[in-house]
């Protein structure tokens, strides 16, 4: 009888012991949680820099970048975008994204600029002077560029020949955005070029940013939004020192023969009105 009673009590004793052990473990866990120390960025990087092995272990555990996308505010200068990043502008927000993490910037995308493309273009897009000399007489191919200048006057066409960076930027942008139409404004002896996009979103690839910022000097290149239109601005900060020899008379004669169709005239008028309001 005594033996039966002892056996019946055993499960109860074990249950109380198990419950007590769980409570102790729970208390220890709570204590550990309370003892968590949060480090500031400077403290974390200071620790990693002094303990090389810890830094390597931390990097091994990373499978994605710490930050793939940063919010940007318009207007944004191209020079302020960190190398290796692109720009994505939309009604829902604007951001700069790591190029290799962007679907649009991958080599198989039309926005990408691969080594093969560089070779095919004979590196023309990587040199302002070379690109200008190769394209300045291709008046029909760059019809929109020259007709927009002619909308001011033939003297404005001549004036543009002293600013090779304008035709260079237009040629680069046209490779990525074939349907662009530039608008020009004059500020004394210098011309500023604006490219207007009417799409809801605009992606400026890492390749475009890299090519323009690496090769165009003394210009403020920026993106802004006005009345639902995205506007890229190419504004000179100083007169260009250009010693390139071009046949001005020949180019002006070719421009004078261009057909300024009603459709292009309307696009020119609409664009000029938008830019005038944008600048006021």
UniProtKB/Swiss-Prot annotation:
Disulfide bonds: none
Keyword Membrane belongs to the record: yes
Post-translational modification: Phosphorylated at serine residues in the N-terminus. This phosphorylation regulates the localization within the inner nuclear membrane.
InterPro entries in UniProt: Herpes_UL31
GO molecular-function terms, A-Z: zinc ion binding
Membrane-spanning parts: none
Primary residence: host cell
Subcellular location: Host nucleus inner membrane
Zn-finger (CCCH-type) residues: 86-203
Keyword annotations: Host membrane, Host nucleus, Membrane, Metal-binding, Phosphoprotein, Zinc, Zinc-finger
Iron-sulfur found in the keyword field: no
GO biological process, one term: viral budding from nuclear membrane
This protein's GO CC annotations: host cell nuclear inner membrane; membrane
Subunit structure: Forms a heterohexameric complex with NEC2. Interacts with capsid vertex specific component 2/CVC2; this interaction directs the capsid to the host inner nuclear membrane to initiate budding.
Function according to Swiss-Prot or TrEMBL: Plays an essential role in virion nuclear egress, the first step of virion release from infected cell. Within the host nucleus, NEC1 interacts with the newly formed capsid through the vertexes and directs it to the inner nuclear membrane by associating with NEC2. Induces the budding of the capsid at the inner nuclear membrane as well as its envelopment into the perinuclear space.
Family: Belongs to the herpesviridae NEC1 protein family.
Listed name of the protein: Nuclear egress protein 1
Gene name of the encoded protein: NEC1
């Amino acid at each position: 009888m005594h033996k039966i009673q002892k056996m019946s009590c055993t499960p109860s004793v074990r249950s109380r012991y198990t419950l007590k052990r769980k409570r102790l473990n729970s208390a220890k866990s709570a204590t550990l949680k309370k003892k968590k120390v949060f480090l500031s960025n400077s403290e974390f990087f200071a620790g990693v820099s002094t303990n090389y092995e810890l830094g390597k272990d931390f990097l091994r555990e990373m499978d994605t970048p710490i930050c793939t996308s940063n919010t940007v505010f318009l207007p944004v200068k191209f020079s302020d975008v960190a190398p290796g990043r692109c720009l994505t502008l939309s009604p829902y927000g604007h951001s700069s994204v790591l190029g290799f993490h962007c679907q649009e910037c991958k080599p198989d995308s039309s926005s990408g600029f691969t080594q093969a493309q560089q070779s095919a273009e004979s590196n023309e897009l990587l040199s302002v002077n070379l690109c200008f000399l190769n394209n300045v007489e291709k008046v029909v191919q760059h019809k929109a560029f020259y007709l927009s200048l002619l909308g001011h006057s033939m003297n404005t066409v001549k004036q543009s020949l002293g600013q090779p960076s304008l035709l260079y930027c237009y040629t680069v942008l046209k490779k990525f955005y074939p349907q662009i139409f530039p608008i020009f404004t004059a500020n004394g002896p210098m011309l500023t070029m604006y490219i207007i996009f009417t799409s809801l979103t605009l992606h400026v690839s890492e390749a475009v940013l890299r090519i323009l910022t690496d090769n165009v000097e003394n210009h403020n290149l920026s993106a802004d939004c006005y009345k639902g239109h995205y506007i890229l601005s190419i504004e000179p900060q100083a007169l260009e020192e250009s010693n390139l020899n071009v046949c001005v008379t020949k180019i002006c004669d070719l421009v004078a023969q261009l057909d300024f169709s009603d459709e292009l005239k309307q696009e020119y008028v609409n664009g000029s009105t938008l830019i005038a309001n944008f600048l006021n």
